[in-house]
Design a protein with these regions (language model features):
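Charged, amphipathic alpha-helical segments
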Residues: 20-31
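Short aromatic-glycine-(Arg/Gly/Cys) micro-motifs in beta-strand/loop hairpins
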Residues: 1-15
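Short linear proline/tyrosine/threonine-rich motifs used for host-factor recruitment
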Residues: 5, 18, 41-43
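Short, surface-exposed loop and linker segments with low hydrophobicity and enrichment for Pro/Ser/Thr
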Residues: 1, 30-37
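Short, mixed-charge low-complexity intrinsically disordered segments
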Residues: 34-68
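Surface-exposed loop/edge segments in extracytoplasmic proteins
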Residues: 12-18, 49-54
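Generic structural motif
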Residues: 8-10, 22, 46, 58
Length: 68
């Protein structure tokens, strides 16, 4: 079995990594998905096509408000 991890960052960049072991894929994903700059991530079981882990993060960008 092989597993593919996809991470999408705030700036639109994305990275993928492939792992042969589920435990390794999940360990790396759990560590990476805690980064605040990750907006989306998933671990996909390549053989079955099943997404076994997923994270979505919505960001609100602060707007500067100037008072006179």
């Amino acid at each position: 079995m092989r597993f593919r991890m996809l991470l999408v960052y705030q700036d639109g960049q994305a990275t993928t990594s492939t792992f042969n072991l589920r435990n390794t894929a999940m360990m790396v994903f759990n560590s990476a998905s805690t980064q605040k700059r990750i907006t989306y991530g998933e671990v996909l079981d390549i053989d079955s096509g099943e997404v076994i882990a997923e994270v979505h993060r919505a960001y609100q960008f602060k707007q500067n408000t100037y008072h006179r």
